[in-house]
Amino acid sequence: MKTIKRATLLLLFAIIYDACPTIACTGISLHAADGSYIQARTIEWAASPLPSEYVIIPRGKKLRSYTPTGRNGITFTSRYGVVGLSVVESDFIAEGINEVGLSAGLFFFPRYGSYEPYDEAHNAITLADLQVVEWLLTQFATIEELKAAVESLRIVGLDSSAVVHWRIGEPSGHEVVMEIVGGDIHFYDNHIGVLTNAPGFEWQMANLENYVNLRAGSAQPLQLGEVTLQPLGGSSAMLGLPGDFTPPSRFVRAAFFRNTAPKRATGEATIEQAFHLLNNFDVPIAVENP
């Protein structure tokens, strides 16, 4: 029975990782005037139906990580209650929040990230990348606590073909991106409030400088010799904003939409605003599967 279950899990892992090119994750964070902090995201899965479920983890639950050779990784007991949405397995929380307000989500990060090589001798401190959200939300109240603890672990992938990176936020609005490159863990303050997929966060931020000409609103009329040119419609000062579904283009589009959006009065109104903004990142299935 254990052999059958492990084979089934390996097949599910293969489905997740093989579909990486068809996954488009776009995350934004928003602040309301009443102090509420909202994290919102999409998971555009254009390959096949994605098994997912609502997960509740109470305090005091004993948990164990998977490794590439089975469920024999690090063991831990939840210190905080957690709610979240999982993919494939209930332990693989894609987005969640704990009882003290720390929130986290994973975003696929193919080709650019790389973990430490898996070594079965270190199973006692080995944590699967797809269980990092489960681990950190059940263990920590702050980002600083996470930073102090994560260096003692070996985070590995259950399949070598893809990796993920993570967005972590506190109720105050302090938000970081965590990436692992060459086995080294990097944290970046996320002041822009956006995350997509590859390339890495530093590259995405540098790429934003290609769009310093963009503005909210309409462009001013231009006198060209004896001809006066007028904008053809509203939001013409955003002409040049990328509209495709690649991660760099979604990052730029989300950054401008998020940072030009008016601040709403309440958290509830900001949740509605987040849905409206993220509608701009729906990926039609036929785009990936013609």
Residue ranges of model-derived segments:
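Short helix/loop capping segments that flank catalytic or ligand/cofactor-binding pockets
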Residues: 48-49, 113-115, 176-179, 186-190, ...
